[in-house]
Curated annotation (Swiss-Prot):
<dbReference type="InterPro" id="IPR001412">
    <property type="entry name" value="aa-tRNA-synth_I_CS"/>
</dbReference>
<keyword id="KW-0862">Zinc</keyword>
<dbReference type="InterPro" id="IPR002301">
    <property type="entry name" value="Ile-tRNA-ligase"/>
</dbReference>
<keyword id="KW-0648">Protein biosynthesis</keyword>
<dbReference type="GO" id="GO:0005829">
    <property type="term" value="C:cytosol"/>
</dbReference>
<dbReference type="InterPro" id="IPR002300">
    <property type="entry name" value="aa-tRNA-synth_Ia"/>
</dbReference>
<dbReference type="GO" id="GO:0005524">
    <property type="term" value="F:ATP binding"/>
</dbReference>
<dbReference type="InterPro" id="IPR013155">
    <property type="entry name" value="M/V/L/I-tRNA-synth_anticd-bd"/>
</dbReference>
<keyword id="KW-0963">Cytoplasm</keyword>
<keyword id="KW-0436">Ligase</keyword>
<protein>
    <recommendedName>
        <fullName>Isoleucine--tRNA ligase</fullName>
        <ecNumber>6.1.1.5</ecNumber>
    </recommendedName>
</protein>
<dbReference type="GO" id="GO:0000049">
    <property type="term" value="F:tRNA binding"/>
</dbReference>
<comment type="similarity">
    <text>Belongs to the class-I aminoacyl-tRNA synthetase family. IleS type 2 subfamily.</text>
</comment>
<feature type="short sequence motif" description="'KMSKS' region">
    <location>
        <begin position="625"/>
        <end position="629"/>
    </location>
</feature>
<dbReference type="Pfam" id="PF08264">
    <property type="entry name" value="Anticodon_1"/>
</dbReference>
<dbReference type="Pfam" id="PF19302">
    <property type="entry name" value="DUF5915"/>
</dbReference>
<dbReference type="InterPro" id="IPR014729">
    <property type="entry name" value="Rossmann-like_a/b/a_fold"/>
</dbReference>
């Protein structure tokens, strides 16, 4: 049976701890899974958060969205795969471990601590953070298989990566190549394009103009501009655009007259910037510059440049390239094929060498600045150019520059040998598969994604690091390669292992090999240095592993099959794959969403997920990014502790459309908490009365109950709400769902329906009208709690346990089926009419306030003036509610006669009639009503004809003195403010009832407690009150009302000139 609520006040923290204990004690999560194990499969793929440590509001938002969708699909009957994932390899962890071990650089990993120990420390760090994050996610009420997460560090997962790379190799989509890439000199590894997006930060760099002497031309120079002086040692050409117009400019310098060549369009700006005067003496197309040779400005300091000059025809010449722009610089581009992507491409066309005299740490390997870090060499190079007379102007520029996404070091462009997935060969297929098979939420993101794929290059997947999936590529001494696809294949191909520099040959038998491998290397661990020990033989050649590891974005890119342990577990893969749904933040559009499709099309020729949703970022209330420097970081645990899990969860799904940025607001969160408090108060009120009456919804026949219009209306609304919430979740318009629930709870249920039925709950005995109200409230909660369960699982569970479970038997609200709308219960016309009724009540209340008539005092009549047929039907159909809520004896549709006051419109008459305006005004003052009725008239005044219309008058309505009016959307409400003795008596009775009820509340009397009321008041009040004594006694649960000296608990009420006493019987 229904019990009185345990908590009278809504306390999220207290309630949520109670429910957590309930779930734990009853093993509810496992029972929910067991219940749905035979349902249709739903493969939800958790995008693995990086195990960097504590979660932030963005991570919390992400997991709250996921948990809500998982709970929703489970209630729909699906057998949901809800395995959480964690991204556990990569540079971020390496950097943290290096800092903890006080290692200064990459070299010290091998010389001070050793690769084996470093890997162990990385693993410890990752697993420790996994535990921390798991507990934080649990604190958000997230139900996932926390005891069985997929981890990118597991052997099965790594083997899935090897399988994928083997497929790429077999398809000719895995290649080694020399390219110019972003390079982190601190981490000493290449970075892929997608790792650099979003990592451009403002910094100051040199901005220099340099003149390259043209050979065989005295005092003629090619003028270039660069922000990377450190790349000048690697300069091999100067690029010009073939179609641009260039100019030879005569300039006056300290050294006398010189001729500089630059783009004609930039002459004025460049001369202004460098501070010299000049004039154009000749112009020509860029293509005419091709082949002009110049003297390298650092020729004497870099011997290799002399060799290039002799060996390569196009070294130190002007070459042509359409990448040259007129946006900045001089229109002539210093070209170093070893340090720029476009430089590399154009250099390849002209057969130039890829020269990069810079090592992994960003230090020069030769020449004048050998051993110097390149950025440290900038000022020295500038000074050298100045001394040699090649520097035209040196300054500074503040611009966006790429930084390492983990250690924040400025990156450099550097040519290195790397391994690439040839995504360029399959990107058309990626786009085709995506467009045909993937549903995007919101839909417009698909276009953005396709554009990103179209513009993407090949994926550099090799990293010169340690903590990652080892690249499964073995190399022979003569440069032949082989890609291993599994641990089993590795063991079969292995002929020896190296342990501490000692070679140990292996027998031929597989089991015998395994025994020795485990004895010498320990249990299987497909990380470095374990896999580095294997020497394999292919085609008669012994091979050792390439030392690189795989880009960490590849780890998460294979998650949809690697988390299923494919190819080891083919059965699970065939049952579940591809994923039904994924959802991540906006930054993942060009990262995880892309890496998955790229890897999947390479491995399986199709996409790995059916539907994908994108959400925004969490910002502070002002729209600023949260950061330590701004001091505006808000931690999820802080929110949970202060406001509770349910308010936090609902707020994050209510505050904004999920694809937009969410500006976190404590005020907004408080607003949501108030809504849940309102829900709780409705529950407490309902459960209290139902428990007192031992209400049992299974013992009543709803077909025999006398449901009122308001009952049918709220049942219609809650069934309509099912559609709103379901559609909102399924189309990822989550605010449609949450705001629908919010408005229903606050406006429909609390402010309107409970307001309408409160008196029905007070009736004694098994009154059918009261039972109809009880049953309606119970039915509404039965639906509403199921709709709210995915959003606010705790409060939904608590209310369900007391109000619903005793009669349906199901152990948890989360084990119920998702509600289906009862179409027969939906009455759209009634919903529209009730909406108008509420507007009429609001307008009528406003009119009463104008007239200063309290709502407790009835009015004689209210007239609704409208032309809207729906409003008319509402007044007729819901008349009882309107009378009750407006405290009016009569509410009717009709017309109110009012006097029209017609005056001249001086603003119109004056400008139009000018000197005759006074005559026209006088005429309108006398004949205004006739003009109003006819609309327009031609009139003769003093022998002159004037055309006068309604525009020339203003019309004011004057109501009878006993009416006050207010407009609403659909018409006007007129309140008759005439007060009769009968109306005064009824109003005064209501005033006294309110005060007696307040006194009962102060004494904390139970609703069923009976009282005796004594009243000291004026003779006039006594006479008026005696006309409604039965009403006063019924409403206050009084057995007697006596007019005598107030006794018992006494309160003086000056505003009604009375002392009232109450005593419990």
């Amino acid at each position: 049976m229904i019990r009185e609520p345990e908590f009278r006040e809504y306390n999220p923290g207290q309630l949520e701890e109670k429910i957590e204990a309930f779930w734990k004690e009853n093993n509810t999560y496992e029972k929910v899974k067991k219940l749905r194990e035979n349902g249709p499969k739903y493969y939800f793929l958790d995008g693995p958060p990086y195990v960097s440590g504590a979660i932030h509001l963005g991570t919390a938002w992400n997991k709250i969205i996921k948990d809500m969708i998982i709970r929703f699909r489970s209630m729909q009957g699906y057998n949901v795969r809800r395995q959480p994932g964690f991204d556990m390899h990569g540079l971020p962890i390496e950097v943290k471990v290096e800092q903890a071990l006080k290692l200064k650089n990459k070299r010290e990993i091998e010389t001070k601590i050793g690769v084996d120990n470093f890997i162990k420390k990385c693993k410890e760090f990752a697993l420790n953070n996994l535990k921390i994050m798991t507990e934080q996610f649990k604190q958000l009420g997230v139900w996932m298989d926390w005891d069985n997460p997929y981890m990118t560090i597991k052997n099965e997962y790594i083997e899935s990566g090897w399988f994928t790379l083997k497929r790429a190799w077999e398809k000719g989509l895995l290649e080694k190549d020399k390219r110019v890439l972003h390079w982190c000199p601190r981490c000493q590894t290449a970075l892929a394009e997608h790792e650099v997006r979003g990592e451009y930060k403002m910094r100051k760099d040199p901005s220099i103009y340099v003149k390259f002497p043209i050979e065989w031309k005295e005092k003629e120079y090619l003028l270039i501009w660069t922000t990377t002086p450190w790349t000048l040692p690697a300069n091999l050409a100067v690029a010009a655009h073939p179609e641009y117009e260039y100019a030879k400019v005569k300039v006056e310098t300290e050294n006398g007259e010189e001729y500089w060549i630059m783009a004609k369009a930039l002459v004025e700006r460049v001369l202004s910037e460098v501070g010299v005067k000049g004039e154009i003496v000749e112009t020509f197309k860029g293509e005419e510059l091709e082949g002009i040779r110049y003297t390298h400005v650092l020729l004497e300091e870099y011997p290799a440049q002399k060799e290039f000059r002799e060996k390569y025809e196009w070294a130190h010449r002007v070459i042509l390239g359409e990448h040259v722009t007129l946006e900045d610089g001089t229109g002539l581009v210093h070209t170093a094929p070893g340090h720029g992507e476009e430089d590399f491409e154009v250099g390849q066309r002209y057969g130039l060498p890829v020269y990069s005299p810079v090592d992994d740490a960003g230090r020069y390997t030769e020449g004048k600045w050998k051993g110097v870090y390149v950025k440290d060499a900038d000022p020295e190079i500038i000074e050298y150019l100045k001394e040699k007379g090649y520097l035209v102007k040196a300054g500074e520029i503040e611009h966006k520059y790429p930084h390492c996404w983990r250690c924040k070091t400025p990156l450099i462009f550097r040519a290195t040998d790397q391994w690439f997935l040839k995504v360029s060969k399959v990107k058309d297929q990626i786009i085709k598969e995506n467009d045909e098979k993937v549903t995007w939420y919101p839909e417009w993101v698909k276009v953005r994604y396709d554009n990103g794929v179209m513009n993407s290059g090949d994926w550099v997947i090799s990293r010169q690091r340690y903590w990652g999936i080892p690249l499964p590529i073995w190399e022979s001494e003569d440069g032949e390669y082989y890609v291993v696809g599994s641990f089993e294949e590795l063991v079969k191909l292995a002929v020896a292992i190296e342990v501490n520099g000692e070679r140990i040959d292996l027998p031929e038998g597989y089991e015998e090999k395994l025994k020795i491998i485990e004895e010498k290397l320990g249990p299987e661990d497909l990380h470095r240095p374990y896999v580095d020990a294997f020497i394999i033989k292919v085609n008669g050649k012994e091979m050792k592993r390439v030392k690189d590891v795989v880009d960490v974005w590849f780890d998460s890119g294979i998650a949809s099959w690697a988390s299923l342990d494919y190819p080891r577990n083919k059965e699970l893969f065939e049952k579940l794959w591809p994923a039904d749904f994924i959802v991540e933040g906006e930054d993942q559009v060009t990262k995880w969403f892309y890496s998955q499709q790229a890897a999947s099309v390479i491995a399986f020729d199709t996409v790995p997920y059916r539907a994908v949703a994108m959400h925004g970022y969490v910002l502070d209330e002002k729209g600023d990014k949260m950061s330590k420097s701004l001091g505006n970081i808000i931690r999820p645990e802080e929110v949970v502790q202060k406001e509770g899990r349910d308010p936090f969860r609902f707020y994050m799904l209510w505050a904004t459309n999920p694809w937009e940025n969410l500006r976190f607001s404590w005020k907004g969160l408080e607003q949501v908490k108030r809504m849940l408090n309102i829900l709780w108060n409705v529950y407490v009120l309902s459960a209290t009365y139902m428990s007192l009456d031992n209400f049992n919804p299974t013992k009543v026949n709803p077909e025999e109950l006398p449901f009122r219009e308001e009952d049918r209306w709220i049942l219609s609304r809650v069934n309509s709400l099912i559609g709103e919430v379901t559609d909102g979740i399924e189309t990822f318009r989550l605010t449609r769902a949450t705001r629908g629930i919010y408005n229903f709870v606050v406006e429909d249920l609390s402010r309107w329906y409970i307001r309408l039925i409160r008196k029905r709950m007070w009736v004694e005995g098994d009154d059918p009208d009261k039972l109809a109200a009880y049953y309606t409230v119970w039915k509404v909660f039965d639906v509403l709690l199921r709709l709210m369960a995915p959003f606010t699982p705790y409060i939904a569970e608590e209310i369900y346990q007391n109000l619903i479970r005793p009669f349906v038997g199901v152990e948890s609200v989360h084990m119920l089926d998702w509600p289906e709308a009862d179409e027969k219960a939906i009455d759209e016309e009634l919903e529209k009419e009730m909406e108008y009724a509420r507007k009429i009540v609001e307008a009528g209340s406003s009119a009463r306030q104008k007239a200063r008539i309290k709502l407790r005092y009835p009015v004689r009549r209210i007239i609704i003036e409208t032309e809207d047929e729906t409003v008319k039907k509402a007044v007729e159909r819901i008349n009882r509610i309107l009378r009750d809520q407006l405290n009016a004896k009569e509410v009717v549709v009709g017309k109110v006669e009012r006097e029209l006051i017609i005056k001249p419109n001086f603003a119109k008459v004056g400008p139009e009639f000018k000197g005759d305006a006074k005559k026209v005004i006088a005429w309108i003052s006398e004949h205004g009503r006739e003009l109003y009725e006819k609309g327009e008239m031609d009139v003769e005044i003093e022998g002159k004809t004037f055309h006068i219309t309604r525009e020339h008058v203003t019309i004011e309505e004057k109501l009878p003195d006993f009416f006050v009016a207010e407009e609403f959307d659909g018409g006007r409400v007129f309140v008759d403010k005439t007060l009769t003795r009968e109306l005064l008596a009824e109003g005064l009775a209501r005033e006294f009832v309110r005060r007696i009820q307040e006194m009962r509340k102060r004494l904390d009397l139970d609703v069923n407690d009976r009282i005796v009321v004594t009243i000291e008041t004026t003779d006039e009040n006594r006479e008026l009150l005696q006309e409604n004594l039965d009403y006063i006694m019924r409403e206050t649960r009084a057995v007697e009302v006596r007019f005598e000296e107030a006794k018992g608990y006494v309160v003086e009420w000056p505003e009604v000139q009375a002392k009232i006493g109450i005593e419990k019987v």
